[in-house]
Amino acid sequence: MNTFLLLLTISLLVVVQIQTGDLGQNSTAVTTPANKAATTAAATTKAAATTATKTTTAVRKTPGKPPKAGASSITDVGACTFLFFANTLMCLFYLS
């Protein structure tokens, strides 16, 4: 039973580390051209190069209420905090 709790605790630690980005890959956003045919034409002719455009979409959030000062609610903490508390609880059970 103690071995099972130890393995479960270690696996939860690894999951949390991957989700927070410590062990995961950091990725960057790449913009792609709007039209592949326009990109090919832009490479071959000078006239098409002036008409080729790239599309970039910007997502704007609608302004809402400003954030309140102070500590956030326990429901706003997310899954990583839940896994952290579960991991701590399992460690305490393992050590007892």
UniProtKB/Swiss-Prot annotation:
Residues 71-96 form a propeptide. Glycans are attached at residue 26. Keywords: Cell membrane, Glycoprotein, GPI-anchor, Lipoprotein, Membrane, Signal. GO terms for biological process: positive regulation of cytosolic calcium ion concentration; response to bacterium. It comes from the Eukaryota. PANTHER family: CAMPATH-1 ANTIGEN. This is CAMPATH-1 antigen. The gene is Cd52.
